[in-house]
């Protein structure tokens, strides 16, 4: 396959070639970030699929597969993959013709087939960030494909879908190729070593101490942490991120950083924020969706107004109308000015099983959060030059297998430097 590939990539490429001639429908390519999974996908499309077609011609048989499609489980992953490969990429949901549907009888959001749903045949389908495929989506992938070859690309050591211990992709005995030779972080051996150690912990369940390395894996005191936050976050810097386990701790960090910047209002013109949950609105007759984790810039904010939520019980919500920009789109949305009140209302109507008001609150108001700190779950799929990790908050998780994955995902978000703060419980390895 040529010297352009390392040994792991070459094994996967050879396996993919054999896979195209086999009766197997699905294949897995797994590995941590920075090992060349995206490069390998391009190589398989540009080199191996043409080799397969040439082999079919030599054998005097037609090529079975007529189309190659690149997809990902999230909009963010699809965008990253499209930019990295210079190929059209869409979400697997869009490809299959699925939308999230609010079930007013149960209060749950489920996947529903649209008029665009059809059964795809004779295609080679790549699905990136496959660790996020839950049982519901996995079933629909099988329903929506016939005589296709599906390549799941991801990292089986990352965090699993919500309420599932592991993606069903990794519970099956599909052909499995693992890439472990790093291409990212290859200038930081200490980062490579700790990421390998934490990956091993996910696989074995054995926690080992985390050893600081000055300038690469720094362990800070309270005062040092405060100084570093001021240094990196006084002015907005999208190359740094603070990550923690709980939403409460994330909110504390973001509130502190907004105070450092002397922000006085719930929202400031020019502020960069991220969308917390998927949101759809209409522009004319066209539906526009802002996906979870999409970056949003506030362009203009109007005066505060009150919205009726439950007038019979004198329940109102204070909001502002804001002009925002996300990607190349500009649109006007309503933003709750008191996020705590907004969240309490959602939880109240959820507990009351009043699904009409519950979904009305979730669907009519954009839930924007500061981008400087996020949960580890939200950070999965992103990389930053410097990552700050709150170890005390992470230690509050009581599930060792979850902690192993949280540590692994947290550390593998960094390109150059990790900053540690707080205490990691001894049962989770501690600090060496």
State what each model feature region is.
Residues 5, 70, 242:
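Conserved SAM-binding loop
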Residues 14, 18, 25-213:
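ASCE P-loop NTPase helicase motor core
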């Amino acid at each position: 396959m040529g010297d352009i590939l390392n040994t792991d990539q070459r094994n996967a490429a050879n396996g993919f070639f054999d896979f195209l001639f086999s009766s197997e429908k699905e294949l897995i390519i797994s590995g941590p970030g920075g090992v060349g999974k995206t490069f390998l996908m391009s190589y398989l499309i540009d080199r191996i699929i043409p080799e397969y077609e040439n082999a079919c011609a030599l054998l005097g048989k037609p090529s079975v597969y007529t189309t190659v499609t690149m997809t990902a489980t999230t909009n963010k992953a699809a965008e990253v993959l499209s930019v990295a490969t210079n190929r059209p990429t869409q979400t697997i949901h869009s490809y299959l013709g699925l939308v999230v549907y609010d079930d007013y009888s149960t209060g749950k959001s489920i996947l529903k087939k649209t008029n665009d749903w059809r059964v795809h045949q004779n295609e080679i389908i790549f699905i990136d960030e496959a660790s996020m495929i839950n049982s519901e989506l996995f079933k629909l992938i099988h329903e929506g494909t016939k005589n296709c070859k599906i390549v799941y690309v991801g990292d089986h050591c990352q965090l699993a879908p919500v309420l599932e211990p592991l993606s069903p992709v990794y519970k099956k005995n599909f052909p499995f190729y693992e890439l472990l030779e790093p291409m990212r972080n290859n200038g930081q051996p200490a980062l490579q070593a700790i990421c390998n150690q934490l990956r091993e912990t996910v696989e074995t369940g054995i926690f080992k101490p985390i050893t600081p390395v000055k300038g690469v894996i720094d362990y800070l005191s309270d005062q040092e942490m405060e100084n570093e936050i001021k240094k990196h976050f006084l002015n907005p810097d999208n190359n740094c991120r603070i990550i923690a386990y709980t939403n409460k701790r994330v909110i504390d960090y973001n509130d502190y950083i907004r105070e450092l910047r002397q922000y006085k209002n719930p929202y400031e013109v020019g502020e960069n924020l991220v969308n917390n949950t998927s949101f759809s609105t209409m522009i004319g007759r066209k539906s526009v969706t802002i996906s979870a984790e999409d970056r949003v810039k506030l362009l203009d904010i109007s005066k505060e107004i009150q919205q009726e939520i439950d007038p019979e019980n004198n329940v109102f919500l204070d909001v502002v109308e804001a002009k925002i920009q996300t990607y190349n789109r500009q649109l006007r949305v309503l933003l709750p000015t008191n996020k705590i009140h907004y969240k309490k209302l959602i939880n109240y109507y959820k507990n009351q099983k009043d699904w009409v008001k519950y979904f009305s609150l979730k669907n009519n108001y954009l839930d924007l959060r500061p981008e400087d700190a996020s949960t580890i779950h939200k950070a999965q799929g992103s990389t930053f030059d410097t990552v700050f990790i709150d170890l005390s908050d992470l230690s509050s998780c009581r599930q060792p297998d979850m902690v192993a994955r949280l540590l692994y995902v947290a550390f593998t978000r960094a390109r150059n430097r990790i900053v540690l703060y707080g205490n990691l419980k001894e049962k989770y390895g501690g600090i060496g």
